[in-house]
From Swiss-Prot:
This is Protein OPG200. It comes from Variola virus (isolate Human/India/Ind3/1967) (VARV). Belongs to the orthopoxvirus OPG200 family. Homodimers. Interacts with host IKBKB; this interaction inhibits host NF-kappa-B activation. Keywords: Early protein, Host-virus interaction, Inhibition of host NF-kappa-B by virus. Pfam families: Poxv_Bcl-2-like (PF06227). Contributes to virulence by binding to the host IKBKB subunit of the IKK complex and preventing host NF-kappa-B activation in response to pro-inflammatory stimuli such as TNF-alpha or IL1B. Mechanistically, sterically hinders the direct contact between the kinase domains of IKBKB in the IKK complex containing IKBKB, CHUK/IKKA and NEMO. The lineage of its organism: Viruses, Varidnaviria, Bamfordvirae, Nucleocytoviricota, Pokkesviricetes. It comes from the Viruses. One of its GO terms (biological process) is symbiont-mediated suppression of host NF-kappaB cascade.
Length: 149
């Protein structure tokens, strides 16, 4: 009997970075980060300083959404529109605070990790990415750029 081990480690462009050099990189970096969060820990590259900062956004998710684990478990991640509406119950304003922006990223990263696959994302973890992209706009990316650096 032989063991079958996967040697693939997901390693996105910004994972090992310490900071971003341009506001134009924020959306791509966040997309990679949520995608990276969808992989099992052993199948993704270790986080650099930039991703460590993004991981800290889960604390903001706890402060805004209170019980993040229960919320993530109970949200209908198979329906992006419904998830966006649920988040808007907590964060109704179009103009969000830095904590609210961070909380959205943290919630979606938590969902991507919770619903993620062993060696590839699942449809629910990818929907967490789509929810984040629906919730954030260029102004939000500009605000969060300062916190990421």
């Amino acid at each position: 009997m032989t063991a079958n081990f996967s040697t693939h480690v997901f390693s996105p462009q910004h994972c090992g970075c310490d900071r971003l050099t341009s506001i134009d990189d924020v959306r791509q970096c966040l997309t990679e980060y949520i995608y990276w969060s969808s992989y099992a820990y052993r199948n993704r590259q270790c986080a650099g300083q930039l991703y460590s900062t993004l991981l800290s956004f889960r604390d903001d998710a706890e402060s805004v959404f209170i019980d993040v684990r229960e919320l993530v478990k109970n949200m209908p991640w198979d329906d992006v529109k419904d998830c966006v509406e649920i988040i808007r119950c907590y964060i109704p304003d179009e103009q969000k605070t830095i904590r609210e922006i961070s909380a959205i990223i943290g919630l979606c990263a938590y969902a991507a990790t919770y619903w993620g696959g062993e060696d590839h994302p699942t449809s629910n973890s990818l929907n967490a990415l789509f929810v984040m992209l629906k919730m954030l706009n260029y102004v939000d990316y500009n605000i969060i750029f300062r916190r990421m650096n």
